[in-house]
Amino acid sequence: MEFYTLKEANANVDLLQKTFDHLATLYKLITDLKNDSYVVLWEREKNHNKHYGKDDGLDLNQLELNRIINQIEDLIDPIIQKGIIVRDIKKGLVDIPSIKEGRIIYLCWVSGETEVSFWHEIDAGFSGRQLI
């Protein structure tokens, strides 16, 4: 496990913010695809599955969803490779391993914060965040 100083953690904030901004856009696309799929399924049901098949858009939606999921994985992988723990993609919440007074802690950052300003014990979670 790699451990970060506060300075090293803050050096990653720009990368993290750009990544989660892009992820928010992809999340919106997923939501739109999901809504489109629900409409198609509703119309299929309403019309008792008449005149619906491969041309109704569901197959294309699934292909697009798979493409977006691959993009999400490609965006998150470099963060994970750095040893940063992605806790919530939608919120942009990460924990960054660090050492405080000889024990392992997590520096905590959420998308929108301009710097890493919080930490918590490894078993405390987000609700246990404390100001640095």
Set out the residue ranges of the language-model regions.
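Intrinsic disorder/low-structure terminal segments
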Residues: 2-3, 51, 117, 125
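Histidine (H) residue identity feature
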Residues: 22, 48-51, 120
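Long, hydrophobic N-terminal alpha-helical segment
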Residues: 1-43
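Mixed-charge, polar/low-complexity N-terminal
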Residues: 4-5, 11, 53-54, 59-61, ...
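Glycine-rich, aromatic-bearing surface loops/beta-hairpins
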Residues: 66-132
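Residue-level signal for alpha-helical context at structural boundaries
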Residues: 26-28, 34, 48, 90-93, ...
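Generic structural signal for short, flexible, solvent-exposed coil/loop and linker residues
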Residues: 5-8, 12-15, 22, 54, ...
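Structured domain cores in non-transmembrane regions
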Residues: 29-70
